[in-house]
């Protein structure tokens, strides 16, 4: 059994770690609230944009934009949103597993995949497994802006415009609540028809100003950007929630470990005292 001094050292070490994880839990809780506010503020715009685009997909358009037309699939692209930091449980790996399963399904059909990464954890993971990373952005911090995302989005849209991609998806964690974050893969292009039953029963027509091509070119790009940005802010809220839960679990586990070590320490101290008493009694008997 380890000596009492060594056990006391271990207890002190765990207590110090527990203080760190408790502080990180509190910081994550504060950041999560701010991330939720940012996510809630951007959701109405993203949802409304999705509805407008859903109208377009079900509409009788006088100009058929390339983003609305299905193609034979030879190569697909993914805009993958991950975190820049760790200590957030299985948030990233669950997302990566889901994406790898879908990429394997495409590969089995002879379809290749390109990846545009948002977040350093995704970059390091997919570089390690041999993914074809064509664009990346990292270090956006806790308050990302749309301008920081333009690079990867532009690369993927250009590839789609040039016919080098036939489908485009955004991959991120959807924030449900503090205890639940769901990895999601959402098709961006070609524009999926709305699943709203009311929209399917209606026939939509539009008047365009100045002209359909100019308007749709801008609107559809804004749609892609808005969905990617929403994925980023949802993923950020998911990250802080997962980190808060992970740090709380670490703090609680630290408390349990301290109790176990305290019990071992008490036993070691008791054994030491018993041994000393035995030696004293033995010495007295010898005299």
From Swiss-Prot:
Principal location: membrane
TM region positions: none
Statement: the UniProt record of this protein carries the keyword Membrane: yes
Location in or out of the cell: Cell inner membrane
Source superkingdom: Bacteria
GO biological process, one term: proton motive force-driven plasma membrane ATP synthesis
GO MF annotations, alphabetized: ATP binding; proton-transporting ATP synthase activity, rotational mechanism
Subunit structure and binding partners: F-type ATPases have 2 components, CF(1) - the catalytic core - and CF(0) - the membrane proton channel. CF(1) has five subunits: alpha(3), beta(3), gamma(1), delta(1), epsilon(1). CF(0) has three main subunits: a, b and c.
Family of this protein: Belongs to the ATPase gamma chain family.
UniProt-recorded name of the protein: ATP synthase gamma chain
Organism: Klebsiella pneumoniae (strain 342)
Lineage per the UniProt record: Bacteria, Pseudomonadati, Pseudomonadota, Gammaproteobacteria, Enterobacterales
Gene (name only): atpG
């Amino acid at each position: 059994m380890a000596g009492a001094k060594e056990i006391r050292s271990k207890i002190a070490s765990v207590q110090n770690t527990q203080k760190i994880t408790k502080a990180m839990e509190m910081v994550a809780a504060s950041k999560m609230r701010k991330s939720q506010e940012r996510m809630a503020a951007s959701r109405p715009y993203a949802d409304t944009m999705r509805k407008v685009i859903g109208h377009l997909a079900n509409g009788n358009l006088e100009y058929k934009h390339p983003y609305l037309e299905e193609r034979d699939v030879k190569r697909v692209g993914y805009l993958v949103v991950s975190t820049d930091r760790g200590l957030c449980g299985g948030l990233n790996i669950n997302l990566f597993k889901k994406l790898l399963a879908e990429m394997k399904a495409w590969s089995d059909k002879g379809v290749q995949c390109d990846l545009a990464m948002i977040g350093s954890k995704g970059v390091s993971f997919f570089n390690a497994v041999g993914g074809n990373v064509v664009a990346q952005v990292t270090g956006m911090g806790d308050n990302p802006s749309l301008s920081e995302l333009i690079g990867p989005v532009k690369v993927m849209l250009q590839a789609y415009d040039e016919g080098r991609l036939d489908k485009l998806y955004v991959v991120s964690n959807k924030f449900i609540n503090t205890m639940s974050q769901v990895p999601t893969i959402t098709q961006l292009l070609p524009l999926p028809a709305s699943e709203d039953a009311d929209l399917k029963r209606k026939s939509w027509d539009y008047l365009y100003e100045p002209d359909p091509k100019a308007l749709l070119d801008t609107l559809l790009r804004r749609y892609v950007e808005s969905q990617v940005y929403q994925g980023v802010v949802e993923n950020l809220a998911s990250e802080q929630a997962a980190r808060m839960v992970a740090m709380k679990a670490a703090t609680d586990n630290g408390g349990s470990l301290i109790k176990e070590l305290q019990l071992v320490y008490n036993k070691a101290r008791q054994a030491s005292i018993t041994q000393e008493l035995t030696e004293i009694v033995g010495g007295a008997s010898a005299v």
